[in-house]
Amino acid sequence: MRLRVAALGRIKSGPERTLVDDYLDRGTATGRAIGLGPFAESEIDTRSLKSSSDESRALAAGLDPGARIVLLDERGKALNSRQLARQIGQWRDEGCREAVFCIGGADGHDRSQLPQPDLMLSFGPAVFPHKLVRVMLAEQLYRAVSILAGTPYHRD
């Protein structure tokens, strides 16, 4: 099952780009043996997008039918790493071909412009910069795959 991060805007070269790429590469390598991956990232050009509705429509346009959709949202469910791993493993075992983790803009998602999500995921009530959320998500996806693969990366 492919795991994809769909995000608004582009991260230029720098420490955040390096970290995102590193975690996505690690996830692809670790997940290959257990049917998870490749890890991918879709960056949506925001220059012509004027509102959260426009942003959400642009995110929706890149979603494949049948993909599991996860919206990152402050009102979502806060899962620990093992719970996220369990959910990803369940989708894989059900034969899902792709799970897409959508990061909205500064004003969040316009839910009326997006398909019904399979999961709304929160990193808690705090507000984080967009670039940092991408790093955190990439790391959590790598961690989830590491848990499912039984590697020693995650410690309880």
Swiss-Prot record:
SUPFAM superfamilies: alpha/beta knot
Primary residence: cytoplasm
Residues the entry annotates as binding S-adenosyl-L-methionine: L72, G104
Organism lineage: Bacteria, Pseudomonadati, Pseudomonadota, Alphaproteobacteria, Maricaulales
Example of a GO cellular component annotation carried by this entry: cytoplasm
Gene3D superfamilies reported in the protein's UniProt record: 3.40.1280.10
Protein name: Ribosomal RNA large subunit methyltransferase H
GO MF term list: rRNA (pseudouridine-N3-)-methyltransferase activity
Species assigned in the record: Maricaulis maris (strain MCS10) (Caulobacter maris)
Family to which the UniProt record says this protein belongs: Belongs to the RNA methyltransferase RlmH family.
Pfam families assigned: SPOUT_MTase
Top class in the EC scheme: transferase
HAMAP family with a match to the protein in the record: 23SrRNA_methyltr_H
Keywords assigned: Cytoplasm, Methyltransferase, rRNA processing, S-adenosyl-L-methionine, Transferase
Keyword Coiled coil: no
Catalysed transformations (reactions): pseudouridine(1915) in 23S rRNA + S-adenosyl-L-methionine = N(3)-methylpseudouridine(1915) in 23S rRNA + S-adenosyl-L-homocysteine + H(+)
